[in-house]
Amino acid sequence: MRPFNDSIQGDEGDRWFIYWLEKNGFTDVKRTSQYCHWDLEGYYGGELYCFEMKNRTFPSYRYNDVLLSKDKYDYLRELPYKVVLATFYTDKFVLIDIKHRSPQEITEKVCKRQTVFKDHRMVPKKVVKWFVKDLKLLDYD
């Protein structure tokens, strides 16, 4: 079960990830996306960790990268807490401590989908990127 859904109360996948964090030593884990710019937070060894969650709908070998908008990356790096980017693929997931693992590339990306507004300009946005081949992929258990 891949842990991601934007619903306020969470879904089975969110509960799985919270359970996984608690099983691995985190305490007081809760959803925070209603009132913070990150999705989950919890304590480990007395320190607060914030989790930004991303969902990729294909296997990790198909995507080959982990992306985060440059604006969000800059914001999260300035937080006084530990910050982890959790990216979920259909086959595995990856956790990146964004304060201690610099992105491998900063690039611009244009969304491939046209919005419902036909006159909407497709504006490129800056993203930071880590390559999957250089990361440790974790199995769902």
Please give the residue ranges for each predicted region.
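Conserved catalytic cores of phosphodiester-cleaving nucleases, focusing on short active-site segments
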Residues: 21, 40-59
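A structural signal for short, well-ordered beta-strand segments and their strand-loop junctions
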Residues: 30-31, 50, 84-87
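Short glycine/proline-enriched coil/turn segments at helix->beta-strand junctions
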Residues: 25-26, 45-47, 78-82
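Short, charged, amphipathic alpha-helix that recurs within catalytic cores of restriction-modification
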Residues: 61-88
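Short acidic/glycine-enriched loop/turn segments that link adjacent beta-strands
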Residues: 34-38, 91-92
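Non-catalytic C-terminal interaction segments of nucleic acid-processing enzymes
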Residues: 23, 43-45, 88-141
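Surface-exposed cleft-lining segments at the edges of enzyme active sites
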Residues: 3-4, 57-62
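Acidic-basic catalytic patches of nuclease active cores, encompassing PD-(D/E)XK
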Residues: 1-32
